[in-house]
């Protein structure tokens, strides 16, 4: 059983002056402290190159430390910030690390810590990642204690770069010490998938090719690159959210039942199903790039001055998948993601096969929708008799909206959940090295095709549209049956973002 980090743990955040730390890491630690899941004896040290004082860092992160409802809690904020300090230093020389080592060891000596517990959070760009890992291992590791290292994506740019990264990391950290964070695995509805699937007989029994007609994993954003064009141009939507976040969701949807919730049992099954994915057919995709909005008020992707004028960067993609195993053989699966669309949401759609005809001439499919964000919810579209004397069908839904059902529950943010898991030593919701390898093997040939000299030109779609032209036909070709116009309206739970 993994050792739980509790009293007198030292958490060091590299890249502490950056946006990720300010908007995600520090607020997540505060959330854990506020709810009683971070021991008040914890010492939190921010480390970066920026010349800041302790007070400078505290003032920088303070506006982002709030309650889940957005309200401030000054007393808790001040208590938390008293646990936070800052040290400036270079990333590429020993000097700053040795100074940091002294600070950590003085704290541990003062607290009479025999077995140090040190958690290092690397909120850093790929360009300096390995240098920092090497210096960290050389200067900040202790033989008498336990170290854990949280690393952020991207975990490589393709299979080759991911393999090279792994080869450099392997001599530095054991797999037990390394926590590759994909924040989607910390989202409440994603963490709910295994319990929902395998803890409910009616769902588990229907979760197969005999009953399921089509599967979709959907990601929509209502905004474009908004100043990140230069960065986004080098990655595109597939690397940004599909090879990592959405694939993690899909593996949890399609994996077999693990023998237990033990981290290795769960990750073993994820790798098994990934290996059963057929290679992506280059003709089984739909790609697009957003243009200006219909009214001209929103810019096109190419209007961004940091983007190459002839860029073929994909900002929307729909990809068909096939899984060659007993459970999923023949079931069409679509993963789709896009920027600059009409709304912001992430959801899973499982459409079931129609019931046999005979007593029913034309009855809609059942459909299970799992809303990951925003406003977590589960809907089951089903058929029922319309109240009254007539024997007519009405399509309705069974509705579990979390904000209504669990009003008095604290639903942790993804980073809160995952940092807590790392403190507990629980790897269940982190990416293992072989899992990363198989995922890149699946996507790299497609990326090479799209980015090669003979790669296709993405279709232009207007900023703010519901979907690019051709998506309805693409989904229909992949087994999805649309409701008749006006026959049913899905519950509206997604505010425009």
UniProtKB/Swiss-Prot annotation:
It comes from the Eukaryota. Pathway: Carbohydrate degradation; pentose phosphate pathway; D-ribulose 5-phosphate from D-glucose 6-phosphate (oxidative stage): step 1/3. SUPFAM superfamilies: Glyceraldehyde-3-phosphate dehydrogenase-like, C-terminal domain, NAD(P)-binding Rossmann-fold domains. The keyword Hydrolase does not apply. It catalyses: D-glucose 6-phosphate + NADP(+) = 6-phospho-D-glucono-1,5-lactone + NADPH + H(+). D-glucose 6-phosphate binds at residues 153, 183-187, 221, 240, 339, 373. GO terms for biological process: glucose metabolic process; pentose-phosphate shunt, oxidative branch. Pfam families: G6PD_C (PF02781), G6PD_N (PF00479). The active site is at residue 245. HAMAP family: G6PD. This is Glucose-6-phosphate 1-dehydrogenase.
């Amino acid at each position: 059983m993994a050792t739980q980090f509790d009293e007198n743990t030292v958490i060091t955040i590299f890249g502490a002056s950056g946006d990720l730390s300010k908007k995600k890491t520090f607020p997540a630690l505060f959330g854990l402290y506020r709810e009683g899941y971070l021991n008040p004896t914890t010492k939190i040290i921010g480390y970066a190159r920026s010349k800041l004082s302790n007070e400078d860092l505290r003032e920088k992160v303070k506006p982002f430390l709030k309650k889940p409802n957005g309200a401030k809690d000054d007393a808790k904020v001040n208590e938390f910030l008293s646990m936070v300090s800052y040290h400036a230093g270079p990333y590429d020389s020993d000097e700053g690390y040795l100074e940091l080592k002294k600070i950590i060891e003085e704290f541990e000596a003062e607290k009479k810590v025999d077995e140090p517990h040190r958690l290092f959070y690397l909120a850093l760009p790929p360009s300096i990642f390995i240098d920092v890992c090497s210096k960290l291992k050389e200067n900040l590791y202790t033989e008498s204690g336990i170290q854990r290292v949280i690393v952020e994506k991207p975990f490589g740019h393709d299979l080759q770069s991911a393999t090279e990264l792994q080869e450099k990391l392997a001599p530095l950290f054991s797999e037990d010490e390394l926590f590759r964070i994909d924040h989607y695995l910390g989202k409440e509805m994603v963490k709910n998938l295994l319990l929902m699937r395998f803890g409910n007989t009616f769902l588990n029994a229907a979760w197969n090719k005999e009953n399921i007609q089509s599967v979709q994993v959907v990601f929509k954003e209502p905004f474009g690159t908004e100043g990140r064009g230069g960065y986004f141009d080098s990655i595109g939507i597939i690397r940004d959210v599909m090879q990592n976040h959405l694939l993690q969701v899909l593996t949890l949807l399609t994996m077999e039942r693990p023998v237990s919730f033990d981290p290795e049992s769960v990750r073993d099954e994820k790798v098994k199903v990934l290996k059963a994915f057929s290679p992506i057919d280059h003709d089984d995709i739909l790609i697009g790039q957003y243009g200006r909005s219909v009214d001209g008020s929103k810019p096109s992707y190419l209007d961004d001055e940091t983007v190459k004028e002839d860029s073929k960067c994909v900002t929307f993609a729909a990809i068909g998948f096939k899984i060659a195993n007993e459970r999923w053989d023949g079931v069409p699966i679509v993963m789709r993601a896009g920027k600059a669309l009409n709304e912001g949401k992430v959801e899973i759609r499982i459409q079931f096969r129609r019931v046999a005809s005979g007593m029913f001439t034309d009855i809609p499919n059942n459909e299970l929708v799992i809303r990951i964000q925003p406003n977590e919810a589960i809907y089951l579209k089903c058929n029922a008799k319309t109240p009254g004397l007539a024997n007519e069908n009405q399509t309705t839904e069974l509705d579990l909206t979390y904000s209504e059902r669990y009003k008095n529950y604290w639903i942790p943010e993804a980073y809160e959940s995952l940092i807590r898991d790392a403190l507990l030593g629980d790897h269940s919701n982190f990416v293992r090295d072989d899992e990363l390898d198989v995922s890149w093997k699946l996507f790299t040939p497609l990326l090479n095709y799209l980015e090669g000299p003979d790669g296709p030109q993405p279709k232009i779609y207007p900023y703010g549209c519901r979907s690019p032209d051709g998506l309805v036909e693409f989904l229909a070709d992949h087994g999805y049956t649309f409701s008749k116009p006006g026959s049913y309206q899905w519950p509206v739970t997604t505010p425009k973002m």
